[in-house]
Amino acid sequence: MDGRAASQTITDKIPYLLKAGIKPTVFSAITGIQDQRFLHRQFLAWGPSAFRFDFRHWFANQYGRGIAYKIMTGLISILLSPFIALEKLCLGYSSQWSWAMPAFLHGLQLIRSGHVDVVYSTGGAWSAHLAALWLKKATGVKWLAEIHDPMVIRSSPEDIGTAIPKNRDARFRQYLERQMINHADHVWWFTEGALHYAKQRNPLLNTAGYANGFVVLPGAEPPGGLASPKPHVYSSKLNLSHFGSLANDRSLSIILKALSALLKKYPEAKESIRIHAYGAALDSLSIEAIKKGGYEDVLIAHGRLEKDPQTGKSGRERVVQKMQEADVLILLHGNDEWCAEYIPSKFYEYLWTGRPIWGITHHNPHLDGMLQERGAYLSQVGDDAGIKATLEKIWLDWKNQGLIEPKWHPMGVDQAVVRILTETK
């Protein structure tokens, strides 16, 4: 789906793959725009729940979300509801599983006709890996697998994910991970933690006859074409800015809680500190904290930035501008155990801005190390005293116009492609 992190992770690699002489044939859902640079086939999933999801997004992209959209999607939902219930009762998998079926059949045709030498599954949605597994078993084609998020969700630091889950979708993902280790030629993850726990569950990884596993840092293309950081201009406000989605497990409420403590010591800070949320609605915990603390003027929700008709700047250009104007960029990691295996994609975009990052992280030494080596403010989820101390340091640094100046060491997508091509040749 265009604009989503899972989509950008692969689409940003395409120019570098083309430059390396690779001729891709892309299979995807119908929820994005068809690429015209190469053969790009878009398939509707065959299962009822995924069909409903894909149809909604396709119709909205084609005709908007007006009255026709409401009528058509309502009719589709009514017609498919008994089949969706049956699908959940019989299988219990996440809705997108059935996309694997058309992808497998079309892939099989291309492989047998000699048009495909390598299958590269990436996700995101695990249906791509399922289709690739079927193709590997049917044809023996070379298979490369890129895993974005952990296939197996652990519950604690002691849990390595070998227990059989009660949830059927989780059981299938556990099975699929084993199959990938057994049958794929190369598998890579985006964090050291993800590779570590996958190896714990699958000791045969990186042994003869099984998948070669390694880590690729996905990086990001310079947002808005940024090539270098711009000198920062301090204003009368300390602007802390967060970009991206929010949820109760990834909430700005933890910063508002720290702000309450700061204001007891520095009451004048309330007039100077502004927290900006771009790109998503506020989570319920943040809304509750705003009401409780009277922070309506402190935390400002801007939502998604669209094209400005007055300046002509696109939404993306406005986002880049706001990132660069921020005194400090907020990186919320979350509080689930799987954060040990996950690095927010926004981190790589932040690196291009040259602005200091305040990372509030959880059980991820890999992410902590990358933040520290570049120069950042760092706190740990659950360490309330540490979060309060970090906010106070930011406040005092800003007052003295001495905020951390991070090292300019961004990661582009080109390095990820070089790593993949080197490991898999």
Segments from the language model and where they lie:
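Acidic anion/phosphate-binding donor-loop and adjacent secondary structure
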Residues: 22, 51, 209, 214-236
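Nucleotide-activated donor-binding/catalytic signature segment of Leloir-type glycosyltransferases, i.e.
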Residues: 277-280, 284-320
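A charged, aromatic-enriched C-terminal amphipathic alpha-helix characteristic of glycosyltransferases
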Residues: 5, 381-389, 395-425
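N-terminal subdomain of nucleotide-sugar transferases
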Residues: 1-55, 186, 262, 267
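Conserved donor-binding/catalytic core segment of Leloir-type glycosyltransferases
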Residues: 232-250, 256-259, 421
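A conserved catalytic-core segment of Leloir-type glycosyltransferases
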Residues: 26-98
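Nucleotide-sugar-dependent
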Residues: 250, 306-324, 329-348, 358-369
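A short, active-site helix/loop in glycosyltransferases that binds the activated sugar's phosphate group
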Residues: 171-212
